[in-house]
């Protein structure tokens, strides 16, 4: 985990009786950190920044680091996990299923959450419709972006 002292903090919180969820992109080994739930949010291929807009170096680094199958396996094998994906297009379900098919041990449908991509209520409603249909078809869970619905696309929420 990136934060200095994060393992000690997690241990202290757990020892104090707190339920601890760690959310991560799944690119860094868990290294024995304690938690009740690991919420893994692997980045899909459309998350790679546009090289023309952000520079070739940034785009290349992101693409090289966005998926670490061996790290996803380490989390899945050693922790109670859920896998959360931000979905902007119905066709992404194929990429999601392919990614999940490579995880060992594989998560069950109830451990997979699909969240519509969007930063405003209108796009969330539009995308939420097809994401809900994907969830009905696959048995995956629907995950709303409640913070945007309640507060809008504001920093700190």
What are the functions of these language-model segments?
Residues 1-157:
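Conserved AdoMet/S-adenosylmethionine-binding subsite of the radical SAM
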């Amino acid at each position: 985990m990136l934060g200095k002292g994060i393992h000690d903090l997690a241990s202290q919180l757990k020892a104090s009786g707190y339920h601890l969820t760690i959310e991560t992109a799944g690119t860094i080994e868990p290294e024995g950190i304690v938690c009740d739930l690991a919420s893994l949010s692997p980045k899909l291929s459309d998350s790679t920044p546009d090289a023309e807009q952000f520079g070739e170096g940034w785009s290349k680094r992101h693409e090289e680091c966005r998926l670490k199958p061996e790290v996803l396996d380490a989390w899945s094998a050693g922790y109670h996990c859920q896998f959360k994906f931000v979905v902007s297009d119905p066709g992404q379900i194929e990429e999601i299923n392919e990614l999940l098919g490579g995880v060992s041990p594989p998560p069950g449908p109830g451990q997979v959450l699909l969240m519509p991509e969007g930063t405003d209520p209108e796009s969330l409603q539009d995308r939420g419709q097809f994401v809900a249909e994907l969830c009905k078809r696959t048995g995956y869970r629907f995950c709303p972006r409640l913070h945007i619905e309640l507060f809008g696309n504001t920093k700190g929420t």
